[in-house]
Every structure is written in structure tokens, then in C-alpha cells.
């Protein structure tokens, strides 16, 4: 019979392996990449994930708009991918086999007026990354325009904790979740207000995804300290207790713990 310590280590390795498989870690897949947004990536701001200014949110220029096959109707927002150029290394790819890791921050819509191999790069079922230009130039030459790539899901490395920006008004609370480490994407969000005597006081209430990574609650939360429970795409959950104090205001951002 194996010693208890060895059994514990084996169990931990099994859990880690399952999480890695859930993220698709190590599973290189074929796709294509183009670029947009200009040399400073200013044209990538905003986007279908709702992150707004990608500089101030910490995503910088290492970002990508995903095609329909990858975007998953917005549930992939915040996920991270490692890409390497797989084209003609003399004409398209940079030498040395460099890779770049990007965060999904936008949607690359299909263009059915053009064929998939002639301008409709993001048409289903193509797995396509429209990279911020600086990210593209880390693996390929500008003149290439479009290159075949190999890609895989990877864990997201973030500085600081998960951030919650509370927008909206009384009875309509729209919470933007950013800077999520690990899986990066958010599959569910719940809110709990402090105290008791209301629908959310002292108990968890699920929020519904409005768009991108904006999550909605129609409860009256004013004057209550807010706790959030985040469940990521790999099934892991994180509770950030009383992350917003009772005197919070709409438009403020609060930072909690990290995965």
C-alpha cells in the first residue's frame, strides 16, 4: 500500500492534470491570425467583452479578437492563448519560433460576403485570431497579413486580484469582471449584500451575464457591502468577501483576491 504522502501527491497531480485538460493546455491546434488596431493598438479599445480601455485594465497590447468558433458567445472573454507562427518561415514567420500569449478581449465577426479563404477570415468554422498589431508582430512579419498558426489555451498570469467595476443604477447593477487569473474566463458570478432583511442581504444571489464579462443583478444593493463569488471556466470558484464597502458608488472598481 502506498504511503499517505504519495497518495496525496498523486491526487494533487491528478487534479492539476484535469484542470489542464479542461483548459486545453498543451493541446496545440491549427488556426490562422491577422492583425488590427494600428501600431499602438489604439483601435482595439472597447470591444465585445466590455473591457473598455485595455491599457488601464492591464491587458495592454497582447490581445485578440476571436472568431465565432472560439468566442463562444462571449464566454471566452478573458481566456488566454499561446500562439506560434506556422507558415513559411522565410516569408511570413519571424525566425526562432517565437510565441506570443494573448487575452481574448473582442469578437471578430464573420463576413459572409467574402469567402473564408479570401477575406472572410472569421467565418465559421474557422478558428481565427485577429491580433492586436504589436502582438502579431511578435511572431510574424507585417507584410504577411495573414499567417497560419498553432495555438493552445494557457493559464492567464495577472498582477493583483480580480477586479469588479460596479455600474448601473438602483435596481440595475452591471458588474464588469476583469483581471481574472488562471482560466481567465468567467462562467458564473454571484453577489451577496451585507446584513439581512432584503432579497440579497446575507445570502448569495446568482447574477446573469448581460454581455461580454458584464454581469447583471436587478436587486437593490445600495448601502450594502458587497461580496462576489466568481466561478471560472475550469470550475474553480473564488470568493471575495466584502470587496466593496457599504459606501460604494456606481462607477467604482474594487479589487479582490486572485485565483
From Swiss-Prot:
The keyword Amino-acid biosynthesis does not apply. CDD domains: DPBB_EXPA_N (cd22274). Residues 1-22 form the signal peptide. Disulfide bonds join 49-77, 80-156, 85-93. It is found in: Secreted, Cell wall; Membrane. One of its GO terms (biological process) is plant-type cell wall loosening. Keywords: Cell wall, Cell wall biogenesis/degradation, Disulfide bond, Membrane, Secreted, Signal. One of its GO terms (cellular component) is membrane. InterPro entries: Expan_Lol_pI, Expansin, Expansin/allergen_DPBB_dom, Expansin_CBD, Expansin_CBD_sf, RlpA-like_DPBB, RlpA-like_sf. Residues 46-161 form the Expansin-like EG45 domain. It is a peripheral membrane protein. Induction: By gibberellin (GA3) and wounding. Residues 171-256 form the Expansin-like CBD domain. Belongs to the expansin family. Expansin A subfamily. May cause loosening and extension of plant cell walls by disrupting non-covalent bonding between cellulose microfibrils and matrix glucans. No enzymatic activity has been found. May be required for rapid internodal elongation in deepwater rice during submergence. This is Expansin-A6. It comes from Oryza sativa subsp. japonica (Rice). The gene is EXPA6.
